[in-house]
């Protein structure tokens, strides 16, 4: 679940949401992707609406990996046969930025 986004995800939390899981299985059945992809959607009144599907690793891959799923290794090994892998639910990621200056003034 993306909590805050401005181009790149600023804050997110891992959650298992059955309606999203079913939607993603339907996307896989329809498009038969080979490799990683991410789905961007919004949920309104309990209904998910997809607005983007990206054939790449998500910018939140660090959260995925910290939650226990090494998506890069799975892609390289081609060992994943389908199904939802176990992951740590409720894990929160927050990004922050700062300005660094160096060199002559």
Tell what function each PLM region has.
Residues 49-52:
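Protein kinase-like catalytic core scaffold
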Residues 1-2, 14, 41, 98-103:
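Short beta-strand element of the conserved SAM-dependent methyltransferase core
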